[in-house]
Amino acid sequence: MPKCEANGHHKIIINKEAPNVPFYTPVQDPPAGTSYDVQPEGSLFSLIKIRNLTLQNRIFVSPMCQYSAKDGVMTPWHKQHLGSFAARGPGLIVTEVNAVSPEGRISPEDAGIYDDGQLGPLRDIVDFVHSQGAKIAIQIGHAGRKASTVVPWLDRKNTAF
């Protein structure tokens, strides 16, 4: 076990495991994004409560289309992408849009929430984000007239912006 010298005494330091995750990841205590400054801080790093939801700060990560899903299922890319934000301490992360039907995706590579098989990978992402002290929200939608097309970089002249 690692030991360190603190005020002339040996102190054992143990890295605690984050709960509710099927693999080891250290718990962040206090969570990343917590202000250590004892002087009055701006509201950005203060808690915010919205009904029954309490967020550790007011830093939110907005949704970003990744065009990296397979048959509407989020992949390890999504876990890495969203998890990298979670480890840096925002109060809330919003996933990219998850389509309500296969035809409602912008492209075949968009995430969906219309099949039970899509829930497992999403659950893994949620568990990891929570293990880092952040909250996560899902953006649900239908692409409307832009639905069932290709990713923007494959056909720029026919992409509706």
Predicted feature residues:
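Flavin-dependent oxidoreductase catalytic cores
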Residues: 1-161
